[in-house]
Amino acid sequence: MIKIETVLDILKKDGLFREIIDQGHYHYNYSKVIFDSISYDSRKVTEDTLFFAKGAAFKKEYLLSAITQGLAWYVAEKDYEVGIPVIIVNDIKKAMSLIAMEFYGNPQEKLKLLAFTGTKGKTTAAYFAYNILSQGHRPAMLSTMNTTLDGETFFKSALTTPESIDLFDMMNQAVQNDRTHLIMEVSSQAYLVKRVYGLTFDVGVFLNISPDHIGPIEHPSFEDYFYHKRLLMEKSRAVIINSDMDHFSVLKEQVEDQDHDFYGSQFDNQIENSKAFSFSATGKLAGDYDIQLIGNFNQENAVAAGLACLRLGASLEDIKKGIAATRVPGRMEVLTQKNGAKVFIDYAHNGDSLKKLINVVETHQTGKIALVLGSTGNKGESRRKDFGLLLNQHPEIQVFLTADDPNYEDPMAIADEISSYINHPVEKIADRQEAIKAAMAITNHELDAVIIAGKGADCYQIIQGKKESYPGDTAVAENYL
């Protein structure tokens, strides 16, 4: 429940309020209205809902439909002239975040907040942190792969970072479930569209940066992408940063007056004696660690999570146990065929993460390598060139290009775009299950490997704007072992 006076106070304090327009009359103050719910979905309103008219695709007919369900008030950046009062604001997304925060009782003040950003590794790092903090605390987690608000039930999120109303609703549920910490993945999109506006994190972690999410409906340039990633540093009380990432010098200057830990080859917090399933650390995490996720980049994610959790009350023993216990669905899952050949299933879905995945596999598997890969339709278009240029440097890999959430595009047209940057022959098979079957058929020795990249644990294909059923890469591969 929230009073209209409270709504207006919040908006005025942040410089967001313009006026209320009611039947052509302008008001600066208003009283005697109470809202029992808030919503940005016009299908989920009642007469006591405060509705937020947001989004580039918002249409007046959504409002008209909501009014037929009894809607009496809305917030917008303009007057849609639909016969009910409107609170006009300068920025609807900022307004929605601040009002949601208050409506749900400021749950951020009752939890320790840990956020991860980076082009890749956010989910893995979040899982490490969740397992570490679970040793001695009661964490909740908002993750692309799995979200849990009670530590017992898990569900998949539609967005890396939820819309602000959903975010504060979930944070409030975590508080009601007696959680002590909240671990989040924070995307650049979350800052671009202000889903976390007004939030300050106890610890913010920057894992890495490489060009991604650049396209017509995402970021217009790398500069814009990197800028929105860096906003997490501004909004965190303490920060953890990978000193080996590109453009580290900018971040180092940006956070010099904040509490911080740097990890990587330039500082005390380093990885030593890196092996497939173990490593040693120096600095604040000095000691020996067991790890189930192979690859140096996963060890880096573990160190980042460990340093963050150390600041949030975890002991070194908690960190060791948590890292050793961590597995992530669809992240470096390994199957073995009857003939001994390995199958690696991973969510790698941009050029940089695919490069690291290939390097890890080729370190351990020295025989024939087959790769099953697609690229998403209608988003991240720059990935296609990145994939093609990378694979052009690996003529030893037999590439099978296929569908990966083609959406409104033709998967074979996407495959053609990727292959236009590759100077050696590749296979193109539209059906992803058939592509996996074909790749596994050519690997028949214990040193051979199939890499199935892109979808990870996703059990759907996005086709024509809808999630169509798909068994999942692991289930498909298991059929052909």
From Swiss-Prot:
Gene3D superfamilies to which the protein is assigned, alphabetical: Mur ligase, C-terminal domain, Mur-like, catalytic domain, MurE/MurF, N-terminal domain
GO cellular component: cytoplasm
Catalytic activity reported: UDP-N-acetyl-alpha-D-muramoyl-L-alanyl-D-glutamate + L-lysine + ATP = UDP-N-acetyl-alpha-D-muramoyl-L-alanyl-gamma-D-glutamyl-L-lysine + ADP + phosphate + H(+)
Positions of short motif L-lysine recognition motif: 404-407
Entry annotated with the keyword Oxidoreductase: no
Top-rank taxon: Bacteria
InterPro entries cross-referenced by the UniProt entry: Mur-like_cat_sf, Mur_ligase_C, Mur_ligase_C_dom_sf, Mur_ligase_cen, MurE/MurF_N, UDP-N-AcMur-Glu-dNH2Pim_ligase
N6-carboxylysine found at: K229
Pathway: Cell wall biogenesis; peptidoglycan biosynthesis
Swiss-Prot/TrEMBL GO biological process terms: cell division; cell wall organization; peptidoglycan biosynthetic process; regulation of cell shape
Residues annotated as binding UDP-N-acetyl-alpha-D-muramoyl-L-alanyl-D-glutamate: S42, T160, T161, S187, R195
Transmembrane parts of this sequence: none
PTM notes: Carboxylation is probably crucial for Mg(2+) binding and, consequently, for the gamma-phosphate positioning of ATP.
Residue positions binding ATP: G118, T119, K120, G121, K122, T123, T124
One Pfam family linked to the record: Mur_ligase_C
Subcellular localization: Cytoplasm
Molecular-function GO terms, alphabetical: ATP binding; magnesium ion binding; UDP-N-acetylmuramoyl-L-alanyl-D-glutamate-L-lysine ligase activity
UniProt keywords, alphabetically: ATP-binding, Cell cycle, Cell division, Cell shape, Cell wall biogenesis/degradation, Cytoplasm, Ligase, Nucleotide-binding, Peptidoglycan synthesis
Known EC number: 6.3.2.7
HAMAP family hit by this protein: MurE (MF_00208)
Family according to the record: Belongs to the MurCDEF family. MurE subfamily.
Known role: Catalyzes the addition of L-lysine to the nucleotide precursor UDP-N-acetylmuramoyl-L-alanyl-D-glutamate (UMAG) in the biosynthesis of bacterial cell-wall peptidoglycan.
Protein name from the UniProt record: UDP-N-acetylmuramoyl-L-alanyl-D-glutamate--L-lysine ligase
Organism of derivation: Streptococcus pneumoniae serotype 4 (strain ATCC BAA-334 / TIGR4)
Gene responsible for this protein: murE
